[in-house]
């Protein structure tokens, strides 16, 4: 159990800042400055959670002291029994709350509350890899549905035998990036492909990248330097062909502030038949691409301090194997194995994400000075 005074001192030191932020977010001048306002409202939520925890912590300590006093001075059996029960309950809750407070005091990834861009690409394995990429997309789509999140596809390149060579979509909702970020990496599948005539098990792979979606003020883009092209998009022929140029392609020269190297970014968006909507989505992906490159330095800095593979941001790392003959899924980062593959592929992935979250929280606690 942590030192009560140490925890209270840390919490008491945040009271003045909480009161200051509470006042600032009602200031019209602050509300007019959207970048500052968004930052302060996030800080307010974090501090509000800490203030609620502080109130409960102080109440538990008071309950214990009051119960001790009753047990020392009261002779009535019923009163003593009630006091003993109150003290036991408070002493049981206290260490649990202390761990919760420690986590609240350790800085979380500032991007956790953001929406996300989800990118899935078929890797080694040809047609089977594309089919598996499609399976992963459906898995995430069903998971997002259970979370009440909104998923919108911005571009898709279908595989010849089904699935996707590449599919990119945006996911909006509460704490999307903080939940899905653990899915970044290489997902490996072992199964008998539908095209396999000998019944042999093949190994294929698909890569998943989860990027925090950038907001307009997260990155600076000179929109006057963007080169736009439009083109027709749609199906292979007949009535599915889009007869107007609704597809958009943008090119933008960007200098990476971390390396000093300039690179050309090329983004296409063909998902809707509305050119302005496609331009809006392409621009959002451009912002996210640039923001992700800059955010990667933050992830690398965190990873260098930790031995865990849970959240290193290394998208080339093999993170999970899906073994169909055995109905088994293994997450290699935490040596976690489950045998409910059918349910997992149907979107039931929260338990695995919870285990990964616990593992990362343990690493965060090691960094805490408490």
Curated annotation (Swiss-Prot):
Pfam family, one: PCRF
Top-level taxonomic group: Bacteria
PTM statement from Swiss-Prot or TrEMBL: Methylated by PrmC. Methylation increases the termination efficiency of RF1.
Residues with PTM N5-methylglutamine: 239
InterPro entries: PCRF (IPR005139), Pep_chain_release_fac_I (IPR000352), Pep_chain_release_fac_I_sf (IPR045853), Prokaryotic/Mito_RF (IPR050057), RF-1 (IPR004373)
Cell location: Cytoplasm
HAMAP family cross-referenced by the UniProt entry: Rel_fac_1 (MF_00093)
Role description: Peptide chain release factor 1 directs the termination of translation in response to the peptide chain termination codons UAG and UAA.
Identification of the protein by name: Peptide chain release factor 1
Native source species: Bacteroides fragilis (strain ATCC 25285 / DSM 2151 / CCUG 4856 / JCM 11019 / LMG 10263 / NCTC 9343 / Onslow / VPI 2553 / EN-2)
Lineage, uppermost ranks: Bacteria, Pseudomonadati, Bacteroidota, Bacteroidia, Bacteroidales
């Amino acid at each position: 159990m942590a030192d009560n005074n140490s925890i209270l001192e840390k919490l008491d030191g945040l009271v003045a800042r909480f009161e200051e932020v509470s006042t600032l977010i009602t200031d019209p001048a602050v509300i007019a400055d959207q970048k500052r306002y968004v930052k302060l409202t996030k800080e307010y939520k974090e501090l509000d959670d800490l203030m609620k925890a502080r109130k409960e912590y102080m109440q538990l300590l008071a309950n214990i002291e009051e119960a001790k006093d009753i047990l020392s001075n009261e002779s009535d059996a019923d009163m003593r029994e009630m006091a003993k029960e109150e003290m036991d309950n408070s002493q049981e809750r206290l260490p649990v709350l202390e761990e919760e407070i420690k986590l609240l005091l350790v800085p979380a990834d500032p991007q956790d509350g953001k929406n996300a861009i989800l990118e899935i690409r078929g890797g080694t394995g040809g047609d089977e890899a594309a089919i598996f990429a499609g399976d992963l997309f459906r898995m995430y789509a069903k998971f997002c549905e259970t979370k009440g999140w909104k998923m919108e596809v911005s571009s898709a390149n279908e595989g010849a035998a089904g699935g996707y060579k590449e599919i990119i979509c945006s996911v909006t909702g509460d704490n999307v990036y903080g939940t899905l970020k653990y899915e970044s990496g290489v997902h490996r599948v072992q199964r008998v492909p539908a095209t396999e005539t000998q019944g042999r098990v093949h190994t294929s792979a698909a890569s998943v990248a989860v990027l925090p979606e950038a907001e307009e003020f997260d990155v600076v883009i000179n929109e006057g330097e963007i080169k736009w092209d439009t083109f027709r998009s749609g199906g292979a022929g007949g009535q599915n062909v889009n007869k107007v140029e609704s597809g958009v392609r943008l090119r933008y020269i960007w200098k990476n502030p971390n390396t000093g190297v300039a690179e050309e970014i090329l983004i296409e968006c063909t998902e809707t038949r509305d050119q302005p909507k496609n331009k809006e989505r392409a621009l959002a992906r451009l912002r996210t691409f640039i923001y992700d490159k800059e955010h990667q330095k933050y992830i690398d800095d965190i990873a260098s301090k930790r031995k865990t593979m849970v959240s290193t941001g290394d998208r080339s790392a093999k993170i999970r194997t899906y073994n169909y003959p055995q109905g088994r899924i293994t997450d290699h980062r935490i040596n976690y194995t489950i045998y409910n593959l059918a349910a997992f592929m149907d979107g039931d992935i929260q338990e695995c994400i919870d285990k990964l979250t616990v593992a990362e929280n343990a690493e965060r606690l090691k960094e805490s000075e408490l």
